[in-house]
């Protein structure tokens, strides 16, 4: 009879990077192309994705929030689920993987988010955290009368600072009397409180966004850059580390990449070229138009990178295209960038992509050696 024992590598030998999946809460995932897989977002699809991710030893799953899409032939992101309710359902059908929902802070009062997060903390057994976004796409909020005016672009992190203050009050103590320019709490209560310290994540790439993350977030997401240039985001991670060091805190960077992999480099490259050839130009034009409406935040924002025509077919997230071995090597290069704690992955086809990652890519990654801790014992 055989059994398995867990063998941990000595700390000095560990080279660890966390892996997450950016679940497709909107139709067609992250490829704005008529040649890409076309599908609607459903709970069953996302359940299958996150359960596969858990089986393949992914560390976390995150969903965005999107309230209006880009249109075009593919109706890109015109069809979306809601983040908190989706992740509550996924928390109930998983057991180990960390679960993160996104709060569109212009639409939800912080006291309500605090209570919803505490509820999902209970459902998940302490596996839940919150991603906070300020909102950049004006039509998402104008359609429901919630856009506060274009001056919001320049003061959104002041708003978010007050927002997170209320959240921390309620999660940490169960009570808040916070008084600010945007929020007024009068003996506001939340109970039960989370059983674990609630993790807050943000996705700031502008100086203001990074300054906020340095002060208030536990992790900061950033875009990877380019195609098969895995370390090109290093200056962004360095800026985040410098901001966190200045604040006296440790805030690691988590980097967004799309993986397009196959058995050979040529096969993977052929898929990538096929997707680019089918780019939905109408939807991409709408994205470009929206990105130009924020004239107050500078050129270093996430949305400016998303709309760059260089690789807009997948909103210019870093893209790793190649054989399983090539992608594994590139992800190890990502892990070697100072300040990097993890990656958030999307796939051209999530169901087959996650299995291929777990079976063919992850076993080749040095930064995932800690998973190979089982050995047969006679």
Curated annotation (Swiss-Prot):
It catalyses: uracil + FMNH2 + NADH + O2 = (Z)-3-ureidoacrylate + FMN + NAD(+) + H2O + H(+); thymine + FMNH2 + NADH + O2 = (Z)-2-methylureidoacrylate + FMN + NAD(+) + H2O + H(+). It comes from the Bacteria. SUPFAM superfamilies: Bacterial luciferase-like. FMN binds at residues 65-66, 131, 140, 156-157, 206. The keyword Oxidoreductase applies. It holds the Pfam family Bac_luciferase. InterPro entries: Luciferase-like_dom (IPR011251), Luciferase-like_sf (IPR036661), Pyrimidine_monooxygenase_RutA (IPR019914), SsuD_RutA_monooxygenase (IPR050172). Its EC number is 1.14.99.46. Keywords: Flavoprotein, FMN, Monooxygenase, NADP, Oxidoreductase. GO terms for molecular function: alkanesulfonate monooxygenase activity; uracil oxygenase activity. GO terms for biological process: alkanesulfonate catabolic process; nitrogen utilization; uracil catabolic process. HAMAP family: RutA (MF_01699). The FMN-N(5)-oxide reacts spontaneously with NADH to produce FMN. Requires the flavin reductase RutF to regenerate FMN in vivo. Belongs to the NtaA/SnaA/DszA monooxygenase family. RutA subfamily. This is Pyrimidine monooxygenase RutA. It comes from Cronobacter turicensis (strain DSM 18703 / CCUG 55852 / LMG 23827 / z3032).
